């Protein structure tokens, strides 16, 4: 499948953008999303994730990943039926990637891929905050996709 995955690395961040693209595409393919879907992913700083979390979620604390789904209900814009489906944007804190990889005892690459998978699943409607059953469903799907990527739990 062909998807448009735009990865932006903030200045000074040396994350593997190809891994991010591959992880996002793996989720879209596993979820059987139609070709042409678009996702934007920004790898940024802890300070920026803190600001976004505060401004958009009302939570005055840093976090590792945020997803901003495009629900397609903005009546100000008309999109032709044959246009690609824009799913939304994801922001990932690279400092959290490094810290959590060390904390959990796995590679930064695995953590970066995991947070990408987690964020894309949120764009597709998965939400671990909706209770234990949904959290378990999301975690199972994350691990299935991480295995597809060759990055299972160690």
Swiss-Prot record:
EC main group: hydrolase
GO biological process terms on file: rRNA processing
UniProt GO cellular component terms: cytoplasm
Cofactor binding remark: Binds 1 zinc ion.
Subcellular localization: Cytoplasm
Binding-site residues for Zn(2+), renumbered to this chain: 118, 122, 128
Family that this chain belongs to: Belongs to the endoribonuclease YbeY family.
Name the UniProt record assigns to this protein: Endoribonuclease YbeY
Source organism of the structure: Chloroflexus aurantiacus (strain ATCC 29366 / DSM 635 / J-10-fl)
Gene from which the chain derives: ybeY
